[in-house]
Amino acid sequence: MKSKWNEETAEILIQQYENQGISKDLALRVYSCRLLGHDPSLVLHGGGNVSLKTSASDGLKGDQQVICVKGSGWDMGDIEPPGLPSMYLDQLLKLQSLTSLVDEDMVTYQRRSLLHPSSPNPSIETLLHAFLPHTYIDHTHAFLPHTYIDHTHAT
């Protein structure tokens, strides 16, 4: 697989978003998400998820550890910063000790964890991204594995 990353394009995006108050981390996450989303061998119908663990200011408590996860309904190839809503990471990590959680409660809790209440709904897979220790997570719905999985003779 050949990398499509371009430092010049990344720097232009960093500068463009910096003027809007968007951090370098988030600008680069937007860029990498778009690269994945534009590769039809990696992403079907704009689907998949990306996340970033970083810090962000909520305006009250100063910098907080957050996770930015692709919002539901956003196309990876056309993502903009609002499509990666920020949530308080410590709030989400509290859910790791639960033995069960119904979907409706999970969605409600994720919404309560948003830095900005008007943000879009984060992905239903947000907790998976939060519980994994990695700063950056890319999860795509690649075409080739699906062709094998969906084959009538797949076992």
What are these regions (language model features)?
Residues 111-119:
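Flexible, glycine/proline-enriched loop segments at strand-loop-helix junctions
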Residues 85-86, 150-155:
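A glycine- and small-aliphatic-rich helix-loop capping segment at beta-alpha/alpha-beta transitions
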